[in-house]
């Protein structure tokens, strides 16, 4: 305490109201990060005072009056913690509550302090038999600990927690295990005050006197935390009531008595003391606190006054303070003349940049009590009066008990209007003349412009939620082409965890990831849960589909079955309240780590680093340096995802500092330097540690998580063209440099450094307009880098699940804080542009096709025979007959409407149960070489035994006689046949391929349901009827058998070729349909066995398919569009 220290200001604290009596101050403390002094009173009210003048800043009710006085404060960067007898309160410094924690176990809490986890966790205790650990972020009790003593004060010093007991003892607790490692006897009564700093602990307390009961001891006890021994006490003859250790001078303490006498002493030399006296007049001292900076202290008296002492020239509270946020200054409105003729729009609106409070989100708006419907005028004009009112004759214009909608919410601009079903369009086109058809086509073109409309928040409609609608014909009747007229396929929704669609699209259009995924998929990998294989299958399907809709069901099913996906909150069903932007960023980190690990399992690495690691890994060395002793430890570090870190709020708000560029943000994020508390092996205690990364190399694909959490970061992204489409990176002697714009061009012109140029491939964006829309994710992707044309131009597309549209680059990279923000960004080296590697097609590992994988003995050769490598190796054009059987894994969801109609919300979900593939030609034509039963691990709703031939137990590995294999095992065989160029022959294959989740080009499909079809009859014929009518065979007598169905389809194809060669195809088809009309298209003796079970679509049974048909032309492609087989020359 210097000579110029004196009392600077006295603040009177009184509760709200007109002249109420003063409420005693129960505790107070200086803020550790801002120029604030916090006080709490006996009624639970918390008040803060700002700066040396002690101006009132905030005041709020932290605890109920019944909870008693506020006992203690603790401070974090985000807020203020306070504790009372039965509750713990956490609020922002502005007074807004973050959480308030109560529990029946909180009976008499007294104190709290931070644990070894820093400000993330606190330990609370009191005069009761339990202590509690509380998570500060979540506001929940995470652990309950039994305790033998009752604690009243708790202080932390280094690795110890010092707790004063109710009986005057001091317990020294280990901050990690919270076990008592030393007990001191401090005072014979209770302890009035205690403080600990560095290596010293000082206490004041009470002792009993014969005549005066309990009195303050005339000394202060001192203990060494270094040796855990008691030192000589410091005398203080007027009675030591309060003691505080100086925050900067480790051996200096300030002792105060209740009458206001203060003494500054050196614990190592107690004889040299500096005395001061506080003028208290008619009160006594109730509290004493030292500022963290050591430049001020405060005293509270019994009259609710706070006295601030310090040097007028140096006084400040924390050592390093952050700016305190104040309310905006309200500008008084200008005076204006007001009359009845003054228009209201002259008042105007204040400038605002956030959603107004009056703009309620859609999920908070509810319709209650619709107005009654208006009575028809014809009824009112014919009413007759009676004693009980009026009555009129019913005009019979409405149905009985018909519900009338009297309030329609205007939602036309909030969601995309679904198109007509294909069956509706087909029926409508048949009834229109040519002129009317052109008019309808023009109207549909105008309807397509609806995708370019905007909602009430200026959100383009193409960003809205898209949903699949289902008619009685199932999903095949939905017009996906309305949403996508590009050569790039979208991904369907209504699949669990389909929020990952946007990220999977981003991987598919990143050539380096795409090439390695397909290279791994072509390897002999047979791990059941390999996500990299599933990613390769999905990418190959998207490329082959070339604009047709696809679904990622197999990938998402494998992903959902991973146990660590649940613990990381990556599954929608287990994380309903987690924001999608957080889930997709966590998924990005998880998938990159997983596929890198899986790639290393199959393909060799050089020096421990695989090709996938070189593509994805940022190699770095992480160093941790102790701020106290400068001891430094270095360890290797690598990461697949770099998370962007933004400047602090006060830096972003400073208008004199220029806004940071994207390259500056990226540099600070990659070289991320943090300060945190950690264990120093040299100091042998927790110290402030400085963490820093030294970059060794950067990958070919730079994956970034936007990690936007503050409003200032959102405003940064809203700056036009803030996100560059090209960046340059230089790594030199461990330093990471990033450039963009003119700086990048300048470095490229100079050519001094080896600079890697990256181009932006795409962005996953979070869309949250709030207008009757659920938050969802979209991807804006530049398809130019993944084009096979070396000179392909940049073309940006929006991928909103199955909606795909070309958009300008400006629109793709435009972000709005209110509804569109980036989540994941992908940059790829420009040297990898257009490097599409298809060499995997020549390196397919086909060993799975020639081996018997079951432990059961091989079936007889007349029932099953594996392919012979030398004579039967699959080749382009080799025909194979295929049929699959399915089971129902989930029932359909149906909504019954008030008018009695039903609408399918989500169709039933089926799973592959058995797949059989037979030879299509050669000596053993018709003999199967694949007949796999698929093991099922999830619950089966219905085995559909009558239509699938699958019985309970057939798909269980423990009980099945068929040795079922994994879905991936069976799928890979079909995938290999597809990429070897085989032609698949079967009946109604579209539904089979969709459930299997594989896309086969039309040139490789021979579908007998399309061969024996006349468009004029609008009905497709089932396999059993065709076998009876064309082949004169009876099939499916007892149950369905996939081998029998596949060989029957093969025979029908051969018979079709005979009809074509003989030139009698058309009369034969007419005869077949004529015969079918006579027997109702059922094979005699079949009864109703061929009717479909509830929930199965017509496509799967070979019935009427709603897709629009055109007259086939001879020589066209196969599959219902042409007559010639792809096998014929």
Swiss-Prot record:
Domain USP: 458-830
Gene Ontology biological process terms, A to Z: mRNA processing; nuclear-transcribed mRNA poly(A) tail shortening
Enzyme Commission code(s) on record: 3.1.13.4
Catalysed reaction, written as an equation: Exonucleolytic cleavage of poly(A) to 5'-AMP
Cell compartment(s), UniProt: Cytoplasm
Co-factor remark: Binds 2 metal cations per subunit in the catalytic exonuclease domain.
InterPro entries assigned to the protein according to its UniProt record, in alphabetical order: Exonuclease_RNaseT/DNA_pol3 (IPR013520), PAN2 (IPR030843), PAN2-PAN3_catalytic_subunit (IPR050785), PAN2_N (IPR048841), PAN2_UCH_dom (IPR028881), Papain-like_cys_pep_sf (IPR038765), RNaseH-like_sf (IPR012337), RNaseH_sf (IPR036397)
GO MF entry, a single one: nucleic acid binding
Annotated spans, Disordered: 396-427, 1083-1129
PROSITE patterns listed in its UniProt record: USP_3 (PS50235)
Family matches, as CDD domains: PAN2_exo, Peptidase_C19P
WD repeats: 20-60, 104-146, 148-183, 186-226, 280-319
Keyword Cytoplasm: yes
Domain notes: Contains a pseudo-UCH domain. This ubiquitin C-terminal hydrolase (UCH)-like or ubiquitin specific protease (USP)-like domain is predicted to be catalytically inactive because it lacks the active site catalytic triad characteristic of thiol proteases, with residues at the equivalent structural positions that are incompatible with catalysis, and it cannot bind ubiquitin. It functions as a structural scaffold for intra- and intermolecular interactions in the complex.
Family: Belongs to the peptidase C19 family. PAN2 subfamily.
Subunit structure: Forms a heterotrimer with an asymmetric homodimer of the regulatory subunit PAN3 to form the poly(A)-nuclease (PAN) deadenylation complex.
Protein name: PAN2-PAN3 deadenylation complex catalytic subunit PAN2
Species, as recorded: Phaeosphaeria nodorum (strain SN15 / ATCC MYA-4574 / FGSC 10173) (Glume blotch fungus)
Lineage of the organism: Eukaryota, Fungi, Dikarya, Ascomycota, Pezizomycotina
